Each structure stands twice: as structure tokens, then as C-alpha cells.
Swiss-Prot record:
Its main location: cytoplasm. Residues 101-110 have a biased composition (Pro residues). It comes from Cupriavidus taiwanensis (strain DSM 17343 / BCRC 17206 / CCUG 44338 / CIP 107171 / LMG 19424 / R1). Pfam families: YbaB_DNA_bd. This is Nucleoid-associated protein RALTA_A1934. Residues 88-98 have a biased composition (Polar residues). SUPFAM superfamilies: YbaB-like (SSF82607).
Length: 110
């Protein structure tokens, strides 16, 4: 009986590992957009944190514009994109891990 339970558990773990790999491949394809300055700066990245593009409104590049402000807006847009990617990842992975007895707030390493 114990041997059968262990074999079942191993099979379940292997299936979950395969599902995790598929989910990570899917997350690499999902893009999120972070914004700052009411959309003047946009960062598009995947849920695997690969930045695809950065868009800066031309008005921010005009002569006399504040370089520090532009740098802050880029950082804020990037951080917004990272938060959205994390939220999307948690949402997608949540359905996969819903049957696991994990403590509340436990973060998996993906």
C-alpha cells in the first residue's frame, strides 16, 4: 500500500513539473505594459521580465526638458511593468498550485 502511494505521489510530482514547464513557456509569451507620466513613458515586457520595448513621448526629448524627470519616468514605468508581470504570473500559477497545501503568502521560485 505504501509503495503504491509513493508511486502515485511521484507521478503527480512529475506531472506538476511538466505543467510548470509549460506554464513558464506560456508566461514568456505574455506581455504586460507599464506606464508612467500619464502614458508618456511605456515599458512592454514579458512575464519572464524580458523587456521588449520602451516608448518615450517625443515631448520628453525636447531641448530643455529635465533629464532627471525622464529617468524617473522610465524607472517608474519599468517598476509598473514588473508589478503587472508579477501579478499576472501569480494569477496564472495560482490555478496550478491551488491543490497544493502551501502556507498563505508562500512564493514559489518562478
Amino acid at each position: 500500500m505504501m509503495k503504491g502511494q509513493l508511486a502515485g505521489l511521484m507521478k503527480q510530482a512529475q506531472q506538476m513539473q511538466e505543467n510548470m514547464k509549460k506554464m513558464q513557456e506560456q508566461l514568456a509569451q505574455i506581455e504586460v505594459e507599464g506606464q508612467s507620466g500619464a502614458g508618456l513613458v511605456k515599458v512592454v515586457m514579458t512575464c519572464k521580465n524580458d523587456v521588449k520595448r520602451v516608448t518615450i513621448d517625443p515631448s520628453l526629448l525636447a531641448e530643455g526638458e529635465d533629464k532627471d524627470l525622464l529617468e524617473d519616468l522610465v524607472a517608474a514605468a519599468f517598476n509598473d511593468a514588473v508589478r503587472k508581470a508579477e501579478a499576472t504570473t501569480q494569477e496564472k500559477m495560482g490555478s496550478m498550485t491551488s491543490g497544493l497545501p502551501l502556507p498563505p503568502g508562500f512564493k514559489l521560485p518562478f
